[in-house]
Amino acid sequence: MLSYQQPDASGHFGRYGGSFASETLTHALTELREAYARYQNDPEFLKEFHSELAHFVGRPSPIYHAARMSREMGGAQIFLKREDLNHTGAHKINNVIGQAMLARRMGKPRVIAETGAGQHGVATATICARYGLECVVYMGAEDVKRQSPNVYRMKLLGATVVPVESGSRTLKDALNEAMRDWVANVDNTFYIIGTVAGPHPYPMMVRDFQSVIGTECLAQMPGMLAGQRIAAEHPDAVIACVGGGSNAMGIFHPYIPHEKTRLIGVEAAGEGLDSGKHSASLQRGSAGVLHGNRTFILQDENGQITETHSISAGLDYPGVGPEHAWLQEIGRAEYVGITDREALDAFHYLCRTEGIIPALESSHAVAYAMQLARTLRTDQSILVNLSGRGDKDIGTVADLSGVDFYDRPSMRGHAVKGGPAA
């Protein structure tokens, strides 16, 4: 088994990671590092964390054998880790609970977050409602338009949603504005970052909270494989979509020592890797500093961040978590691209063959799993992290498919009738 101990004490994964933040945030980051070091192995903290995951989130999430899909691909058996079944509909809640528990212990009454697809924003608003914390969510104005159901969910849960009009009006810009808020309100505010990026300790901390995904898989997969008469304890490949990369790192990390299992991250190739309209930082980016850490980013020859594109708001980001950059460099993980069209086709295919509506982000991982399965034997296996459900995306998919999503009698202006139940 591979020996793997990352990051180092300063938050570096090889030459990536670290902490590149303004002097104003130095004290806040030191305070956060000390708090996490104090509680990360504290029995009472961990007991509460796992209790919340079990009773509030509904963990462990099941693994499902996609039998019909596997049969139609004619190769490897495909298994889905059903993070879409979590409370709030995605993997994001795992990390948010852990960070919100830290916020309470640190005496921070106000929480801020950034969001792209809206799932991290919904998860943050949810746990702030549960814990009685003020919640402000920054979201790119473009994402506000394409993820309107999640915007309304956040507001229902009591959050203030701030549309960000600067730059490309997507996730990168939302993160920039959240950082500015944190600088201005550092004394009473806790910033819950939603991915394995940002200055140390965020990449490590988010990974640790999300690693419950892979830890469960290590326990679940032997039985699932035995049920299909596959003589193995681990899958031949683990596949997950990668934007910032938290769902991927959550399922990858416990598998890193198991060298016979391939770890495959799927980036958003958009309109094609050579089109200039994609979000594939690891395949078309270069090393640089973004949002407080050194990683692979999409930048021009002058070091300016270039605009990105993806059909999925959650993958529309010009960087990636530093641990992913390190895993690629040492050859432990590999990264591929899936286009908008391939992801959309996989979205429809999973709906119609397995009765599961996946998030567009997750559809990228499903699409590559379908491609890979055809090249493997029927006694081999693929585990896909189905990171979220697609309810939030049906408006986008309908638009792209030429369907009038709102073709129904209007309910606007209709009074709600009836009084209290007798």
Swiss-Prot record:
Pfam families with a match to the protein in the record: PALP (PF00291)
EC number(s) on file: 4.2.1.20
Record key words, sorted: Amino-acid biosynthesis, Aromatic amino acid biosynthesis, Lyase, Pyridoxal phosphate, Tryptophan biosynthesis
Database matches in PROSITE patterns: TRP_SYNTHASE_BETA (PS00168)
InterPro entries linked to this entry: Trp_synth_b_CS (IPR006653), Trp_synth_beta (IPR006654), Trp_synth_beta/beta-like (IPR023026), TrpB-like_PALP (IPR001926), TrpB-like_PALP_sf (IPR036052)
EC category: lyase
Sites of N6-(pyridoxal phosphate)lysine modification: K92
Pathway: Amino-acid biosynthesis; L-tryptophan biosynthesis; L-tryptophan from chorismate: step 5/5
One GO cellular component term noted in the UniProt record for this chain: cytoplasm
Reaction(s) this enzyme catalyzes, per UniProt: (1S,2R)-1-C-(indol-3-yl)glycerol 3-phosphate + L-serine = D-glyceraldehyde 3-phosphate + L-tryptophan + H2O
GO molecular function, one term: tryptophan synthase activity
Obligatory cofactor(s): pyridoxal 5'-phosphate
Family the entry assigns: Belongs to the TrpB family.
UniProt function note: The beta subunit is responsible for the synthesis of L-tryptophan from indole and L-serine.
Quaternary data: Tetramer of two alpha and two beta chains.
Protein name: Tryptophan synthase beta chain
Protein's organism: Paracidovorax citrulli (strain AAC00-1) (Acidovorax citrulli)
The encoding gene: trpB
